[in-house]
Regions:
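Bacterial N-terminal signal peptides that target proteins for export
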Residues: 1-6
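C-terminal motif of bacterial Sec signal peptides marking the signal peptidase cleavage site
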Residues: 15-17
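Bacterial signal peptide processing site
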Residues: 19-21
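Kelch-like beta-propeller repeat domains
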Residues: 29-340
Length: 340
C-alpha cells in the first residue's frame, strides 16, 4: 500500500509551493472522457477524495481519488451503485488531490476546481466541468485559493459554494466563493477561520451549508452555517475537536453523520472509529456492532435513492491508504467491498 506523510494538517510533498494563478486560455479545452461502456473496476486505495451523488447517472461518484502520485495520468472517476464500483471516465484533466468538486443538479455538470496535480510539486487554479461525456476547462478568473478547498452545490441559489484553502503563496485563505457556471464571485472574507480537513456539506431541507471541525490554528470543534450569503457560528456539544473525518448529510432523515477522523494534531496516533449523528440540534454517538476500522480522511456520501451513507477508503494509523467500502443503513455498518 502507498504511504503518506502529514505534518499538522499540511501535506509534505516537496519544497515547491503553489503555482502562480493559472493563465486564462483564449479558448476552452475540451476533452472526451466517457468510457464506451462502464468498466467494472474497484478504485485504488486513497484518502480525502470526494464522494458525490450524481442524480442523472444514479451513482455516487468518487472524485480526486489518486493512488500513486508518481504517475502522470488523467483524472479517473469511479461510480458506486450499491453493489459494485465502475470506472465511468477515461481521459480528462490531470489527476489531482485536495481540490474541490461539486455536482450542479440544475445544469447537470460535475465541477472540479484546483488541487495538486499528481507530481505533487504545484497546485493549480483550473476550473473544469464534466457533463457526463466530456470535460471542458472554463476560461475564467479563479478564486484566490488553489488547494485544500471544499465545495458543495447550493440548490437554493443554484450555485456551487467554495470555502478556504491555500493561495499560490501557501497562505491560508478564509474566503467564500460561488460558481454559477460562467464566473467565480467572492461572497465573503469573514466568518470561519481558514482551515483544512474539515467537513462541508449541504442541507437542502434548511437550504444551508454546514461546516464542522477541521484544522485551523489547532484541531477545532467549531460548527458554522452558511445561509443567505452569510456565516453564523452555532454550538451543539458533540464529537469535540476533530479533523480528517468523513461527513455526509442524510436528506431522507434530515440528519448529519460524521465518521472517523483525528482528535488531535498528532493525526495518525489519534484516529477514531466513532460514528456520530446530529439531528434536531442534538449530537448522539452511535454504537453499532460492526464498524469500519479507525481511519482518517475517509470519503463519505449519501445515496438518496437507496437511502444509504457510504464510506470509502481513508488512511490508517500506519499511514497506509485504504480501499474498503462500507454502507450505513440507519442501524448498522455493512462492509461491501475489499472487506478484511
Amino acid at each position: 500500500m502507498r504511504k503518506i506523510l502529514i505534518v499538522g494538517w499540511f501535506l509534505i510533498f516537496s519544497t515547491a509551493g503553489c503555482s502562480s494563478a493559472t493563465p486564462i486560455a483564449s479558448t476552452p479545452t475540451i476533452l472526451p472522457t466517457l468510457a464506451p461502456t462502464p468498466i467494472l473496476e474497484n478504485p485504488p486505495p486513497c484518502w480525502e477524495a470526494d464522494l458525490i451523488y450524481h442524480s442523472q447517472l444514479q451513482l455516487l461518484l468518487l472524485v480526486n481519488c489518486v493512488e500513486d502520485p508518481s504517475k502522470e495520468t488523467p483524472l479517473t472517476i469511479w461510480g458506486w451503485d450499491g453493489m459494485q464500483w465502475q470506472r465511468v471516465t477515461q481521459g480528462g484533466p490531470p489527476a489531482r488531490i485536495l481540490g474541490g468538486s461539486a455536482y450542479d443538479e440544475k445544469r447537470n455538470v460535475l465541477i472540479l476546481y484546483g488541487g495538486r496535480p499528481i507530481d505533487l510539486g504545484k497546485c493549480n487554479q483550473e476550473t473544469w466541468e464534466w457533463d457526463g461525456k466530456t470535460w471542458t476547462q472554463k476560461v475564467v478568473t479563479p478564486p484566490t485559493a488553489c488547494d485544500h478547498v471544499k465545495m458543495v452545490y447550493d440548490a437554493a441559489s443554484g450555485e456551487s459554494i467554495l470555502f478556504s484553502g491555500l493561495d499560490p503563496s501557501e497562505n491560508l485563505i478564509n474566503e467564500t466563493w460561488s460558481w454559477n457556471g460562467e464566473e467565480w464571485k467572492k461572497l465573503s472574507d469573514t466568518g470561519p477561520e481558514s482551515r483544512g480537513h474539515f467537513g462541508f456539506v449541504y442541507d437542502p431541507g434548511h437550504e444551508q451549508t454546514l461546516l464542522y471541525g477541521g484544522y485551523a490554528s489547532t484541531v477545532t470543534d467549531e460548527f458554522w452555517v452558511w445561509k443567505d450569503n452569510a456565516w453564523q457560528e452555532v454550538y451543539f456539544p458533540g464529537p469535540g475537536p476533530l479533523s480528517h473525518f468523513g461527513m455526509a448529510y442524510d436528506t431522507d432523515s434530515n440528519a448529519l453523520y460524521i465518521f472517523g477522523g483525528a482528535i488531535s494534531s498528532s493525526t495518525f496516533s489519534s484516529l477514531t472509529d466513532k460514528t456520530w449523528i446530529l439531528r434536531e440540534g442534538s449530537w448522539r454517538e452511535l454504537a453499532p456492532e460492526n464498524s469500519p476500522s479507525r481511519r482518517g480522511a475517509p470519503s463519505m456520501g449519501f445515496d438518496p435513492i437507496r437511502k444509504r451513507i457510504v464510506v470509502y477508503g481513508g488512511f490508517d494509523s500506519n499511514r497506509n491508504n485504504l480501499a474498503d467500502t462500507w454502507e450505513w443503513d440507519g442501524q448498522q455498518w455493512v462492509c461491501l467491498s475489499n472487506c478484511k
